[in-house]
Amino acid sequence: MATNPSNGLEGDNTLQSICYHRGSLKLLDQRKLPLETTYLDIKDASDGWLAIREMVVRGAPAIAISAALSLAVEVSNLENFNGTPVEAASFLAGKLDYLVSSRPTAVNLSDAATKLKEVVSKAAAAASNCQSVFQAYIEAAEIMLADDVASNKAIGSYGARFIQNQQKDPTKLSVLTHCNTGSLATAGYGTALGVIRALHGEGVLQRAYCTETRPFNQGSRLTAFELVHEKIPATLIADSAAAALMKDSKVSAVVVGADRVAANGDTANKIGTYSLALCAMHHNIPFYVAAPLTSFDSSLSSGKEIIIEERSPKEMLNARGGLGEQVAASGISVWNPAFDVTPASLISGIITEKGVITKTGMDDFDIKDFINKAG
């Protein structure tokens, strides 16, 4: 992966984690933010896998889009592939399986791979040459990129409206969020941070609060970076300060993202989310999850079935999420899960691009019913 310095902005002056033009993909190296803005050239699926695994790009939607586009770039520039359409489809399916192995918890990646396999399988059945299959794949991956931005804006709109309707004073809101769920975690705009952006755009957001999100510091490095860039009034807090902030009545609502949502609404998200949900319930503060339907996994009946990725001990032993000098005692053992699961019983509502999923007296959500009605 080659580096390419950039100012990190597209023509509309928004932060971009993914810069794609057919045959070319550049990913913002988020490990170096906010002090350095560097893009890495992604030439093929191997580069994409490494970028995802090493946290160059992170955030469930961005991971899925980056994986799909890394393979699109590879096949755009592929020479001397002389196989049949069926062999082309098999080649793509194998690459997609490889990309899915980069990070197992976020369902968006496996969901995207499944959909893309279906596209190439259908294309292979009708194609007379391998290039037609590759072209079908490239176009499908590009549609996913555009669709992600549109769904994020819908999430922001639905979430802002719903939260305002649930508040006694909808004109003065303060919202707490965790990890990074904005333009840097998606193809653009963001999920939970998109809701905050929408509230700010409507002039009703007094303040956004973001946690540091240890140990990789996505909140302090990335969310704070986005909030400052967007000129949204914001305050950074330590993860351990959230309960005190809520006790002082400074939080109207908590909005977080999701890496995987089970059929009952149990939600896997960045480690520390479960703690925030418990604090919010204790202080009678609504706790919302904002996620596209691609983050839902109906094959899992509950969060107990979600595989939780464990990260390197170095992220905790060393400063800057493992990138800096050692700060912990040598020889200490480390438990470093990247995610935790928040039970549906602690979640007030799940904000999607099709509307807000609510409960009717039950601890669980009826995700299947909502999806069926939403079409």
Swiss-Prot record:
List of catalytic residues: 259 (proton donor)
Record keyword Isomerase present: yes
GO biological process: L-methionine salvage from methylthioadenosine
EC numbers, comma separated: 5.3.1.23
Isomerase as UniProt keyword: yes
InterPro entries, per the entry: IF-2B-related, IF-M1Pi, IF_2B-like_C, Initiation_fac_2B_a/b/d, M1Pi_N, NagB/RpiA_transferase-like
Gene Ontology molecular function terms on file: S-methyl-5-thioribose-1-phosphate isomerase activity
Pathway the protein takes part in: Amino-acid biosynthesis; L-methionine biosynthesis via salvage pathway; L-methionine from S-methyl-5-thio-alpha-D-ribose 1-phosphate: step 1/6
Short name of any one Pfam family annotated for the protein: IF-2B
Entry keywords, A to Z: Amino-acid biosynthesis, Cytoplasm, Isomerase, Methionine biosynthesis, Nucleus
GO cellular component: cytoplasm; nucleus
Swiss-Prot/TrEMBL catalytic activity: 5-(methylsulfanyl)-alpha-D-ribose 1-phosphate = 5-(methylsulfanyl)-D-ribulose 1-phosphate
Domain of life: Eukaryota
Location of the protein in the cell: Cytoplasm; Nucleus
Site (Transition state stabilizer): 179
Function: Catalyzes the interconversion of methylthioribose-1-phosphate (MTR-1-P) into methylthioribulose-1-phosphate (MTRu-1-P).
HAMAP family for the chain: Salvage_MtnA (MF_01678)
Family: Belongs to the eIF-2B alpha/beta/delta subunits family. MtnA subfamily.
UniProt protein name: Methylthioribose-1-phosphate isomerase
Origin species: Populus trichocarpa
Organism ancestry: Eukaryota, Viridiplantae, Streptophyta, Embryophyta, Tracheophyta
